[in-house]
Every structure is written in C-alpha cells, then in structure tokens.
Swiss-Prot record:
InterPro entries associated with the record: ATP_synth_B-like_membr_sf, ATP_synth_b/b'su_bac/chlpt, ATP_synth_F0_bsu_bac, ATP_synthase_B_chain
TM region positions: 2-22
GO MF terms, alphabetically ordered: proton-transporting ATP synthase activity, rotational mechanism; proton-transporting ATPase activity, rotational mechanism
Protein name: ATP synthase subunit b
Oligomeric form and interacting partners: F-type ATPases have 2 components, F(1) - the catalytic core - and F(0) - the membrane proton channel. F(1) has five subunits: alpha(3), beta(3), gamma(1), delta(1), epsilon(1). F(0) has three main subunits: a(1), b(2) and c(10-14). The alpha and beta chains form an alternating ring which encloses part of the gamma chain. F(1) is attached to F(0) by a central stalk formed by the gamma and epsilon chains, while a peripheral stalk is formed by the delta and b chains.
Principal subcellular localization: membrane
Role this protein plays: F(1)F(0) ATP synthase produces ATP from ADP in the presence of a proton or sodium gradient. F-type ATPases consist of two structural domains, F(1) containing the extramembraneous catalytic core and F(0) containing the membrane proton channel, linked together by a central stalk and a peripheral stalk. During catalysis, ATP synthesis in the catalytic domain of F(1) is coupled via a rotary mechanism of the central stalk subunits to proton translocation.
Gene encoding the protein: atpF
Compartment annotation: Cell membrane
Keywords: ATP synthesis, Cell membrane, CF(0), Hydrogen ion transport, Ion transport, Membrane, Transmembrane, Transmembrane helix, Transport
Domain of life assignment: Bacteria
C-alpha cells in the first residue's frame, strides 16, 4: 500500500502553498489582465463597428450627392441642348425670311429694270419709226398725219408682249 512519509506530506503541503501563492500572485493578476485585454478588444470592436457605420453613412451620403450632381448635370445638358436646338431653328427661320426678302427684292429690281428697258425700247422704236416713216413718206404727208401714224404704231407696239 501506500506509505505516508514525511517528505510526501511536506511535498503535498508545499504544493498546496504553491497553489495558494500562485492563485494570489499569478492567477488573479493574470485573469485580471486577460479580462482587461478582452474588454479592450471588445471596445476596439465596438469602435470599429461604429466607425464602419459612420463610413457607411458617409458613403451613402456621398452617393446621394453624386446622384444629385449627375441629375443636375443631365438637366443642364438637356437645357443647353434644347436652347441650342431652339437657336438653330431660329437661325433657320431667319435665313428663310431673309431668302424670301432677298427674292422679293430681286424680283422687284428685275421688274423695274424690265420697265426701264421697255420704256427705252419704246423710245427707240418711236424714234426709228419716225425716221423710217419720214423716209418712206418723203415728206409728202403732213405732220398731223405723221403723228397719228406714230401714235397708232406706239399703241400697237405697247400691246406687244416684251
């Protein structure tokens, strides 16, 4: 069986004293240190979570701001495009109006030149008619008959399409 001797008993007593001493000196401070370390880690995790939430809120805020900025930019582009199209239509309308005005001016100028040419032509025809008639008649007709013949000729010449 087991023998109890004094050294075994002394070793058991020494072991118990060592356990009490280690509990007082090492175990409690070690547990306190581990507890503090655990609390510190939990605080860091909570702080990191809080910062992550703040970062998420900032990201959402920035995304909303970017969306608003894109919408405003799109609106500005649409307004500028519409203004450009309206300006182009106005320029085209002005060009059409100017073309019509220039055409009317040109037609009026052509008509004036035509009337002027007709008047000059009539004057030349009258002069030539008088000369031709004078030579044909050889001064045998009276000037009254000559004028009547010329008037008839001018009247007939005025009815000609020129």
């Amino acid at each position: 069986m087991l023998e109890f001797n004094a050294t075994l008993l002394a070793q058991i007593v020494d072991f118990i004293i060592l356990l009490i001493f280690l509990r007082l000196v090492a175990y409690k401070p070690l547990m306190k240190l581990l507890s503090e370390r655990s609390e510190h880690i939990e605080r860091n995790i909570a702080a990191a979570e809080k910062e992550r939430q703040q970062a998420e809120q900032l990201r959402a805020s920035y995304e909303a701001e970017m969306r608003r900025a894109r919408e405003q930019a799109q609106e500005i582009i649409q307004k500028a495009t519409k203004a450009g199209e309206e300006q182009a239509l106005q320029i085209i309308e002005n060009a059409k109006n100017e073309t019509v005005r220039m055409k009317e001016t040109a037609l009026a100028e052509i008509e004036r030149e035509k009337q002027k040419a007709m008047a000059e032509l009539r004057d030349q025809v009258v002069t030539l008619s008088i000369l031709v008639a004078g030579k044909i008649i050889n001064r045998s007709m009276s000037s009254e008959i000559q004028h009547e013949i010329v008037r008839d000729f001018i009247k007939e010449a005025g009815e000609l399409p020129c």
